[in-house]
Amino acid sequence: MMPNIICLKAVISGKVQGVGYRYSTRAKAQSLGLVGWVRNLPDGRVEAMAEGERTQVDKLIEWFKQGPPAAEVSKVDVDEESLGEFRAFEILR
């Protein structure tokens, strides 16, 4: 049986910049075997694209709601995307 591969884009709001959110997201995504990227947005939010097995992506989405210890997440918006061509999980600048 083929694994259920999905790609989701998440936009995380709250106190999520300057608290190590991107670095923690990359570490968490890598530990879950996911590929994609994470970046800061000019308006103070963080945006992430994650692709992999549905169960693992769901775990990352749940983690987004908490984030690293210094983060204060107020909202996580998630949209399903078409599969990308990611080879790793990167921090975009």
Curated annotation (Swiss-Prot):
Q: Name one GO molecular function term.
A: acylphosphatase activity
Q: Which residues does the UniProt record annotate as the domain Acylphosphatase-like?
A: 7-93
User: What Pfam families does UniProt report for this protein, alphabetically?
Assistant: Acylphosphatase
Organism name: Acaryochloris marina (strain MBIC 11017)
Protein name as annotated = Acylphosphatase
PANTHER family in the cross-refs: ACYLPHOSPHATASE
* UniProt lineage: Bacteria, Bacillati, Cyanobacteriota, Cyanophyceae, Acaryochloridales
Annotated keywords: Hydrolase
On the tree of life, the source organism's domain of life is Bacteria
Recorded hits in InterPro entries, A to Z, give:
Acylphosphatase, Acylphosphatase-like_dom, Acylphosphatase-like_dom_sf, Acylphosphatase_CS
| Family label | Belongs to the acylphosphatase family.
Q: Where is the active site?
A: 22, 40
Against NCBIfam families, the record matches this protein to: PRK14426.1 (NF011000), PRK14442.1 (NF011014)
EC identifiers of the protein: 3.6.1.7
Q: What reaction(s) does this enzyme catalyze?
A: an acyl phosphate + H2O = a carboxylate + phosphate + H(+)
